[in-house]
Amino acid sequence: MPQLRTFIDSGVLLAAFKAAGELAENALAVLGDAERRFVSSDFVRLELLPKPICYGNDAERLFYETFFANVEPLVQASALLVEAAEREAEAVGLSAMDALHIAAAKQAACDEFVTAEKSTKP
């Protein structure tokens, strides 16, 4: 059976690293699922890596770097991706970063998008 192409939002990775509470348990369950092939983007990297690098949190940095080393593909920023994100944001009222994540997931033909956002958010 083919693996699900799963785009992981930054909130899921942040929760998994913190490893406390129900959200963390759910995040770790998704990340530990061998039936998934993970996809991410430059934008998720930008959301997660700068602070642990700046403040010397090596454990957090290594956690994220290990994840990013194993995603396929890592969707890269491009003018076309930004245009697609703008259309997405205008169509459903997303914030800029959320729209970039959705556009990246669509560009990578993901089967699902896993986020820590509330289900009521567009």
Placement of each model-derived feature along the sequence:
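Short, well-structured N-terminal submotif of metal-dependent ribonuclease cores
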Residues: M1-S40, P52-F63
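A generic structural signal for short hydrophobic patches within well-formed alpha-helices
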Residues: L13-L14, R45, T120-K121
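Active-site neighborhoods of divalent-metal-dependent phosphate/nucleic-acid chemistry enzymes
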Residues: P73-S119
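Short, intrinsically disordered, charge-balanced linker/junction segments flanking boundaries
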Residues: T66, K118-P122
